[in-house]
Amino acid sequence: MTNMRKSHPLIKIINHSFIDLPAPSNISAWWNFGSLLGVCLALQIITGLFLAMHYTADTTTAFSSVTHICRDVNYGWLIRYAHANGASMFFIFLYFHIGRGIYYGSYTFMETWNIGVLLLFAVMATAFMGYVLPWGQMSFWGATVITNLLSAIPYIGPTLVEWIWGGFSVDKATLTRFFAFHFILPFIITAMVMIHLLFLHETGSNNPSGLNSDSDKIPFHPYYTIKDILGVLFMALALLMLILFSPDLLGDPDNYTPANPLNTPPHIKPEWYFLFAYAILRSIPNKLGGVLALVFSILILMLFPSLHLSKQRSMSFRPLSQCLXWILVANLIILTWIGGQPVEHPFITIGQLASISYFCIILILMPTMSLTENKLLKW
């Protein structure tokens, strides 16, 4: 009699995905982030569901309802901070996951990579709308500034903005629809994650060497289940430290002031995980140019498979490309820092230089370096 795990229509899908899946024997801790992102998504959906039970999507009561959750609901403070800081962990892991993909050439799995980029857009949209819901000062003004960017679209822009707002400014209608979208998007993301995994399992996982590993595979369980559980424990430790010791470390103090359309905060800025893109947006004086640069700064990820000119897949044996990749990381850290600074000298110039460097490294230097390395190896 065949094992139920291998014959049952539903259980065998789980079996082929997480138990009997043949995995490369040499994948490092950089391959842990996929499972960590899955855990983060589950955590966000569960905590979000409990928050939605007590939250009211109305401009007059939204801020008070969040305060009520923190003060009066049993462990409400824990749920709220787990959700807020869980989002930060989500983005840390997302950026590590994408960085891993760039470093080890995982983007050559075209379908998996492109679904991944769409997932990034969906997660960014969800996080942005979630930031609006507490209806603090930064929520309101962040929503106003970011939605206003759409007015840069020629001809239909201003109409589009008013259509999204549901009026002539960010108000009750905007908050209600943002809550609706913020609730539904994580489920759409979950479906997209399944497609992401479906495409990944068509090809099998990449590995640090970038070479075909068909000749040396090991079962996912117990080897990588144990490894993933260890990663989850480390994540739980970091997240609990953040929630219990400094829950507001990554937040903005302005969001503890209720939204006031008559009083603009001195420095409007998004959450830390959007600062790099915000810095690129601000570095271009023209409104439409800034919006295009902002969108392209993420969309550029889709060009990676086309820009891969090296004869080797991974950067493991390409020291020159490795240097560029780490320069790109440093550049993104600089952009993140600049995004949080006021628009004044010398930050404007640094931001413009860092933005130019970002596009130059990806579009010009990395492909050139790949060709140079091919020449050095006489390929």
From Swiss-Prot:
A ubiquinone binds at H201. Gene3D superfamilies: Cytochrome Bc1 Complex, Chain C. GO terms for molecular function: metal ion binding; ubiquinol-cytochrome-c reductase activity. It comes from the Eukaryota. It is a multi-pass membrane protein. The chain crosses the membrane at residues 33-53, 77-98, 113-133, 178-198, 226-246, 288-308, 320-340, 347-367. Binds 2 heme b groups non-covalently. One of its GO terms (cellular component) is respiratory chain complex III. Heme b b562 binds at H83, H182. Heme b b566 binds at H97, H196. SUPFAM superfamilies: a domain/subunit of cytochrome bc1 complex (Ubiquinol-cytochrome c reductase) (SSF81648), Transmembrane di-heme cytochromes (SSF81342). One of its GO terms (biological process) is mitochondrial electron transport, ubiquinol to cytochrome c. Its cofactor is heme b. It is found in: Mitochondrion inner membrane. InterPro entries: Cyt_b/b6_C, Cyt_b/b6_C_sf, Cyt_b/b6_N, Cytb/b6-like_sf, Cytochrome_b, Cytochrome_b_C_euk/bac, Cytochrome_b_N_euk/bac, Di-haem_cyt_TM. Keywords: Electron transport, Heme, Iron, Membrane, Metal-binding, Mitochondrion, Mitochondrion inner membrane, Respiratory chain, Transmembrane, Transmembrane helix, Transport, Ubiquinone. The cytochrome bc1 complex contains 11 subunits: 3 respiratory subunits (MT-CYB, CYC1 and UQCRFS1), 2 core proteins (UQCRC1 and UQCRC2) and 6 low-molecular weight proteins (UQCRH/QCR6, UQCRB/QCR7, UQCRQ/QCR8, UQCR10/QCR9, UQCR11/QCR10 and a cleavage product of UQCRFS1). This cytochrome bc1 complex then forms a dimer. Heme 1 (or BL or b562) is low-potential and absorbs at about 562 nm, and heme 2 (or BH or b566) is high-potential and absorbs at about 566 nm. Belongs to the cytochrome b family. Component of the ubiquinol-cytochrome c reductase complex (complex III or cytochrome b-c1 complex) that is part of the mitochondrial respiratory chain. The b-c1 complex mediates electron transfer from ubiquinol to cytochrome c. Contributes to the generation of a proton gradient across the mitochondrial membrane that is then used for ATP synthesis. This is Cytochrome b. It comes from Dactylomys boliviensis (Bolivian bamboo rat).
